[in-house]
């Protein structure tokens, strides 16, 4: 989701700095004070200099938006790439169609026929799409310097019981082909160039014998020399960064789940580089940004003022754009902070603008009859907005795009 700025690293150089394949520095990690994020004053009052543009991106007739968290700007600086979770499918027992959060239809036991990787031109016209049957849960997306598209598939189609089902409930049918928990590199016309990880991944978490297998990879970004960095961990036991060379050969892994200030993450959800080559990690469940040395992964700074970030993007002027999709809804403990997109400086960390959730305060999200439902505190319907928006990107003209999971939208924000 984040743009990769030139930092001049090599695989050998990274290894020489002692990134350990065991996942942490030799010394014990520095611990964050308990509830450190609670001491940070909410940055809710910055001005909003943007208009919200609804319905900008057009899908083909008969297809509606499903969930999306993956959005990126093309090499041309104007076109927009999206990883979308396969729109709509027929409802159960011939009922009305339902919007989806997965390209795997567990009820029918098959993959969607829709292409999940979409490219729109600057007018919102769909110009190309690909990837049908290849991924279950497109989660993160990145465009490298050559214009290639990288997508993380953050889940799999292995049989599971739905939340709330009894332990002895029958499992859904097994798939004919296991898909998921991989990272793909495509050419701009959709040719598969490289695959990282094995299909289905490793749901048990990081395996010392197979550290290059994933479970719920969140985001991917590339270094100037072509090395590949993947952020993994979406609530399970694994929270780490995994480094590969440009051919896909595993180099090392770093980090573990925790609240510490050195080498610990809890849902490293999005990645970006600034112009100095520092690595910004949206450490979502820790309600912070961790700023790391991109060579050693040593922590340089920790910021709480951008809130609970699902998505992060840094432009060439070192302006940082952070999407908070969970405060007050998925995470009520962070309820003093408002959901939305915070904008500020990657140099000094000052927040200068805030696009609040157009759905309004007190809005909750749920699925009703297979459709996303937003409710205001008074019980009335709420409008679509940045509620559950996870991905954020900015084009060369400063237009902001937010990819939304709950409302099933790609929002556009233009200067007032």
Please tell me what each predicted stretch does:
Residues 1-12:
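Bacterial N-terminal signal peptides that target proteins for export
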Residues 17-26:
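C-terminal segment of classical bacterial N-terminal signal peptides
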Residues 25-416:
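Sequence-structural signature of mature extracellular/luminal beta-sheet repeat domains
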């Amino acid at each position: 989701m984040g743009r990769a700025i030139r930092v001049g690293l090599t695989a050998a150089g990274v290894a020489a700095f002692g990134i350990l394949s065991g996942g942490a520095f030799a010394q014990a990690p520095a611990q964050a004070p308990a509830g450190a994020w609670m001491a940070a004053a909410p940055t809710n009052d910055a001005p909003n200099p943007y208009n919200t543009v609804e319905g900008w991106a057009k899908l083909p007739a008969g297809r509606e938006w499903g969930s999306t968290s993956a959005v990126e700007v093309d090499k041309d600086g104007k076109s927009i790439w999206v990883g979308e979770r396969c729109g709509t499918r027929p409802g159960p027992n011939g009922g009305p169609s339902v919007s989806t959060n997965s390209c795997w239809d567990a009820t029918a036991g098959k993959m969607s026929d829709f292409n999940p990787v979409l490219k729109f031109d600057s007018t919102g016209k769909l110009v190309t799409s690909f990837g049908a049957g290849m991924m279950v849960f497109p989660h993160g997306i990145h465009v490298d310097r050559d214009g290639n598209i990288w997508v993380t598939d953050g889940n799999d189609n292995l049989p599971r019981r739905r939340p709330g089902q009894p332990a002895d409930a029958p499992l859904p049918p097994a798939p004919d082909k296991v898909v998921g928990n991989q990272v793909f590199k495509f050419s701009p016309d959709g040719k598969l160039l490289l695959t990282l990880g094995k299909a289905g991944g490793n749901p048990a978490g990081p395996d010392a014998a197979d550290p290059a297998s994933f479970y719920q990879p969140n985001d991917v970004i590339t270094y100037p020399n072509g090395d590949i960095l993947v952020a993994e961990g979406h609530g399970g036991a694994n929270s780490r960064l995994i480094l590969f060379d440009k051919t896909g050969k595993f180099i090392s892994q770093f980090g573990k789940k925790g609240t510490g200030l050195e080498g610990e993450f809890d849902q490293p959800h999005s990645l970006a580089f600034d112009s100095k080559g520092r690595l910004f990690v949206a450490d979502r469940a820790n309600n912070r940004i961790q700023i790391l040395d991109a060579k050693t992964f040593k922590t340089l700074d920790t910021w709480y003022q951008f809130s609970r970030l699902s998505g992060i993007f840094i432009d060439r002027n070192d302006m940082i754009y952070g999407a908070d999709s969970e405060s007050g809804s998925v995470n009520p403990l962070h309820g003093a902070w408002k959901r939305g997109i915070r904008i500020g400086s990657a140099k000094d960390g000052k927040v200068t603008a805030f696009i609040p959730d157009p759905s309004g305060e007190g809005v909750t999200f749920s699925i009703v009859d297979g459709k996303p439902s937003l409710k205001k505190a008074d019980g009335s319907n709420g409008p679509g907005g940045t509620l559950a928006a996870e991905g954020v990107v900015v084009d060369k003209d400063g237009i902001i795009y937010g990819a939304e999971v709950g409302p099933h939208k790609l929002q556009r924000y233009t200067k007032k």
